[in-house]
Amino acid sequence: MHCPFCGKYDTKVTDSRLVAEGDQVRRRRQCNDCGERFTTYETAELVMPRVIKGDGSRETFDERKLRAGMLRALEKRPVSAESIEAAVERIRQRLRARGEREIEAREIGEEVMRSLKRLDQVAYIRFASVYRRFQDLDEFRAEIDRLAQEPSFSPDDADKR
């Protein structure tokens, strides 16, 4: 690594430590030429899969779209920002863990629905109504009935999934 002070490439690592819950390595370095010390942080570069949209077009995964869709469904609901961010991160981790280069937008929508079902059932119904394009009250009722048949989750369960 080159020295940010003198630009030479002859540096040595003097200390390495895990930080950020083990997701990052902090390294103290020293330039062998000018003697200056500096810190670098190393993280794994994890590429998200490309998204195959319903019309067959492809686009880069956009975490902002994921978060915006969830926030829209959770608007004015008693769910903390921390819980929402944790859910977004869990979805990202599950998508990355698949190891696929591409994923259908439908599958991302299903992941969002699973997360919302655990976070807030009203938000789940809101999202499902748009995502599944409910046309009338009967479709709402059917989804609510399906939801009522499933075992309920406590907020603590959402953190475990």
Swiss-Prot record:
Keyword Coiled coil among record annotations: no
Top-rank taxon, per record: Bacteria
Co-factor(s): Zn(2+)
InterPro entries, sorted: ATP-cone_dom, NrdR-like_N, RNR_NrdR-like
Domain ATP-cone: 49-139
GO BP of this protein: negative regulation of DNA-templated transcription
Record note on cofactor: Binds 1 zinc ion.
Residue spans, zinc finger unnamed: 3-34
Function text: Negatively regulates transcription of bacterial ribonucleotide reductase nrd genes and operons by binding to NrdR-boxes.
Protein name per its UniProtKB record: Transcriptional repressor NrdR
Lineage: Bacteria, Pseudomonadati, Pseudomonadota, Gammaproteobacteria, Oceanospirillales
